[in-house]
């Protein structure tokens, strides 16, 4: 085997040697033309060209949180939470405000767009109440792959029991989505109740109806 031996002025050396087994073909590695920056590592493009690149830091690359701020009442109907001005990032104590981790979600008319391709965990929670009665409530995450046609991808089904006045309940659903096209892949949220009047408890100071988005991996 051949070695490239670099000898220090103090007498000791560092050697670069060939693989333990015979390569399947001749290999040529091309060194980069410039030094990298602190913390970078040398990587190959798969064809022998070497370059310096920053290594992933680990952990989440994006985390975002939005809440619905408006309380509203409806009877035996469906509402899509599509009022742009009723969605905000939490600005209460320790809230993210305008500072999501990484590049956050964008929202227009209650339709949420993703900042980049990847795997995202979506969590949607609601709070609601009814006076002197019981009813069924439903919450939904809907998704589109063509920026037009939406389908339900997650739902909760719950009954508010008539045990006191008012009667409260909370729901929680989640969905792991694989986003490959940020122009066409989007999500929105929907609430529904049967029968009597139900109040959906949006709030500008607390997360009562809220959505959390976590990017958990790249594609």
Residue locations for each model-derived region?
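Extracellular jelly-roll beta-sandwich "head" domains, especially the C-terminal globular C1q domain
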Residues: 57-219
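Extracellular repetitive beta-rich solenoid segments
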Residues: 1-60, 108, 132, 192-196, ...
């Amino acid at each position: 085997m051949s070695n490239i031996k670099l000898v220090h002025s103090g007498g000791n050396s560092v050697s670069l040697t060939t693989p333990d087994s015979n390569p399947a073909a001749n290999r040529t590695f091309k060194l980069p033309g410039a030094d990298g920056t602190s913390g970078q590592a040398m990587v190959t493009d798969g064809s022998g060209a070497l370059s310096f690149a920053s290594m992933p830091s680990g952990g989440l690359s994006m985390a975002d949180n939005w809440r619905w701020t408006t309380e509203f009442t409806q009877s035996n109907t469906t509402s899509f939470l599509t009022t742009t001005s009723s969605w905000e990032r939490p600005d209460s104590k320790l809230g993210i405000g305008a500072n999501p981790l990484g590049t956050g979600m964008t929202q227009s008319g209650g339709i949420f767009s993703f900042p980049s391709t990847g795997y995202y965990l979506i969590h949607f929670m609601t709070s609601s109440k009814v006076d002197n009665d019981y009813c069924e409530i439903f919450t939904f995450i809907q998704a589109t792959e063509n920026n037009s046609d939406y389908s339900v991808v997650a739902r909760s089904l719950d009954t508010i029991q008539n045990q006191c006045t008012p009667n409260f309940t909370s729901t929680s659903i989640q969905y792991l989505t694989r986003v490959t096209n940020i122009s066409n892949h989007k999500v929105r949220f929907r609430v529904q109740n049967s029968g009597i009047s139900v109040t959906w408890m949006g709030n500008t100071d607390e997360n009562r109806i809220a959505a959390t988005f976590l990017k958990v991996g790249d594609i």
